UniProtKB/Swiss-Prot annotation:
GO terms for molecular function: RNA binding; RNA methyltransferase activity. GO terms for biological process: methylation; RNA processing. It comes from Mycolicibacterium vanbaalenii (strain DSM 7251 / JCM 13017 / BCRC 16820 / KCTC 9966 / NRRL B-24157 / PYR-1). CDD domains: SpoU-like_RlmB (cd18103). The lineage of its organism: Bacteria, Bacillati, Actinomycetota, Actinomycetes, Mycobacteriales. It is an enzyme of class 2 (transferase). S-adenosyl-L-methionine binds at residues 265, 285, 294. The keyword Cytoplasm does not apply. This is Uncharacterized tRNA/rRNA methyltransferase Mvan_5337.
C-alpha cells in the first residue's frame, strides 16, 4: 500500500559519485594572452629551423678568425662581386629587416640559383661577426682562398695580348694593404699578385672587403721562396722592378711598356736584401712635400698608374 511500503530503494555505493570538476581557473588562458603573433620558424629557439640558424651563426662567428679556415666576406659590394664571379660559398647571411636594394636582391637571387643556403639572422649576430659593424646587413661564408701557382700566374699573363703586368709583395703584413693592391692591379690591367707563403698578409675577409671584390677576378699566387720565383720570372723575360723609398731612380724613368713585375716593399721595412739584389732596378716615387714615404698600397697604385699611362702612349 502506498506510503506503507517497507521496500528499501536503490542505494548508491559509497565513493562512486563524481565530485565537482576542478578547472584551471583561467591560468592557461591568461598565460596565452599578450604573446602576439607566432614568430617565424628560424626565430623560434626550439624549432629545427631556429636551431639550424643559431648553429650557422655561431659557426660563422668563430670561423672568420682563422686564416686557414672558412672566411666571411662582409658588405654588399664584396658579397655581390664574389657571387657574380662564381666564388664557392656555403652560406649567405641576411640581417632581419635589412634595407633592400639592387645589390642585396641580386645577391639573394644568385645564391638561390646556385643552391647556396640563405639564412636570415638577427642583426646582432652579424655585428658579432663583423667587429667593426660594417656588414651592411649581409655576409657570405666562403671556403679558404684558392691560391694560384706562380707558374700559372705567369702563363696566364703571357697568354694575354697585353704585356705581362704582375705585382709581388715583400714584407706586406697588413691584409688591408694586400686588398687595396689587388684592387689597383685589377683597375690598371694587371694580371695578378704574388705573395710569400710565410710572413705575409693572406687573402682574408679583411683583404676581400678592401679589394671591393677584386680578389674574385684577380688571381693571387703564393710562393714558397719569393726570391726564387722572381728569378724564374726574370729568366722568362720579365723586368723585375723594386719599389722602395731609397730607390736608385724614379718611377717615371722606367720602361713599363714591356713585360714587368713590380715588387712592393713595406712602408717600414722596405725590400728585403735578397729581393733587392735580384731586381733589375729599384725605383722611388718623387714627392714635392716633406712626406718621407707613402703607404705601400698607395705607392703601388702610383706605379701601376704610371705603367698604364706609358702603355696607352706606346
Amino acid at each position: 500500500m502506498a506510503g506503507n511500503s517497507q521496500r528499501r530503494g536503490a542505494v548508491r555505493k559509497a565513493g562512486t559519485k563524481k565530485g565537482p570538476t576542478v578547472g584551471s581557473g583561467g591560468v592557461r588562458r591568461r598565460g596565452l594572452e599578450g604573446k602576439g603573433a607566432t614568430p617565424p620558424a628560424h626565430q623560434r629557439p626550439h624549432h629545427p629551423a631556429g636551431k639550424r640558424a643559431a648553429k650557422a651563426a655561431r659557426q660563422a662567428q668563430g670561423r672568420h678568425k682563422k686564416t686557414d679556415d672558412t672566411e666571411i666576406v662582409l658588405g654588399r659590394n664584396p658579397v655581390l662581386e664574389c657571387l657574380r664571379a662564381g666564388v664557392p660559398a656555403t652560406a649567405l647571411y641576411v640581417a632581419l629587416g635589412a634595407d633592400s636594394d639592387e645589390r642585396l636582391t641580386e645577391s639573394v637571387q644568385i645564391a638561390a640559383d646556385k643552391g647556396i643556403a640563405i639564412l636570415e639572422v638577427p642583426r646582432h649576430d652579424l655585428d658579432r661577426i663583423a667587429a667593426n659593424g660594417m656588414h651592411q646587413g649581409i655576409a657570405l661564408q666562403v671556403p679558404p682562398y684558392n691560391y694560384a701557382h706562380p707558374d700559372d700566374l705567369l702563363a696566364e699573363a703571357k697568354s694575354d695580348a697585353m704585356p705581362a703586368l704582375l705585382v709581388a709583395l715583400d714584407n706586406i703584413s697588413d691584409p688591408r694593404n694586400l686588398g687595396a693592391i689587388v684592387r689597383s692591379v685589377a683597375a690598371f690591367g694587371g694580371h695578378g699578385v704574388l705573395i710569400p707563403q710565410r710572413r705575409s698578409a693572406s687573402v682574408t675577409a679583411v683583404a676581400w672587403r678592401t679589394s671591393a671584390g677584386a680578389a674574385a677576378r684577380t688571381p693571387v699566387a703564393r710562393a714558397t721562396n719569393l726570391t726564387r720565383a722572381l728569378k724564374q720570372w726574370a729568366d722568362a723575360g720579365l723586368q723585375v722592378v723594386g719599389l722602395d723609398a731609397d730607390g736608385d731612380t724614379t718611377v717615371d724613368q722606367i720602361d713599363g711598356a714591356g713585360p714587368i713585375v713590380v715588387v712592393v716593399g713595406s712602408e717600414g721595412k722596405g725590400l728585403s736584401r735578397l729581393v733587392r739584389e735580384n731586381c733589375d732596378a729599384v725605383v722611388s716615387i718623387p714627392m714635392a712635400g716633406p712626406t718621407e714615404s707613402l703607404n705601400a698600397s698607395v705607392a703601388a697604385g702610383v706605379v701601376l698608374a704610371e705603367i698604364a699611362r706609358q702603355r696607352r702612349s706606346a
